[in-house]
Amino acid sequence: MKRFARKETIYLRGEEARTLYRLEEGLVRVVELLPDGRLITLRHVLPGDYFGEEALEGKAYRYTAEAMTEAVVQGLDPRAMDHEALHRVARNLARQMRRVQAYEAHLQTGELRARIARYLLFLADTPLSARDRQGIYVTVSHEEIADATASIRESVSKVLADLRREGLIATAYRRVYLLDLAALEREAGSALEAA
């Protein structure tokens, strides 16, 4: 088991893929750096999920994996895995594929406001969420929201300010409080599921 700090890179695009990973605790995102310098989130890895699947083929990692929270990760040698273990990996990757397909639909449907509402509700069911005396919040930056909603930070900041003015959310440093879940669900239009 290895611990990674928030924002720490687990592997980089182009590195030789010798290790298949399983997330034990925390939240990881798989990202791609675009030619224009923007980072886009391709997939969220939840506890129990496998990632770095390029190791199953013995290829280089195609994307970069980064911890969004403090994360505990188990490294596995796919060559040492038995048939049943590989079958578990395949089932998990199939579940993740369904999430990725839903995530693609999320990015391609609705205005930015709806995409942000969906993403905040999605994060409420991940290790990025917590509760304090003010209510449920997610620990996320405007930049991370932009990366996950095919947007830019400035546009995200404007939408968050509108949602805050309307009483749907409150914000603090790297925290977004979800004050009115029903209204956020109406804004979202459809759910982006974590499981």
UniProtKB/Swiss-Prot annotation:
InterPro entries named among the record's database cross-references: cNMP-bd_dom, cNMP-bd_dom_sf, Env_Response_Regulators, HTH_CRP, RmlC-like_jellyroll, WH-like_DNA-bd_sf, WH_DNA-bd_sf
Residues in HTH crp-type domain copies: 110-182
Gene3D superfamilies linked: Jelly Rolls (2.60.120.10), Winged helix-like DNA-binding domain superfamily/Winged helix DNA-binding domain (1.10.10.10)
PROSITE patterns (UniProt xref): CNMP_BINDING_3, HTH_CRP_2
Pfam families according to UniProt: cNMP_binding, HTH_Crp_2
GO terms for cellular component: cytosol
Null mutant phenotype: No production of carotenoids in dark or light conditions. Does not activate expression of TT_P0044, TT_P0049 or TT_P0070 in dark or light conditions.
Classification via SUPFAM superfamilies: cAMP-binding domain-like, Winged helix' DNA-binding domain
GO terms (BP aspect): cellular response to light stimulus; positive regulation of carotenoid biosynthetic process
GO molecular function, one term: DNA binding
Protein name: Transcriptional regulator LdrP
Protein source organism: Thermus thermophilus (strain ATCC BAA-163 / DSM 7039 / HB27)
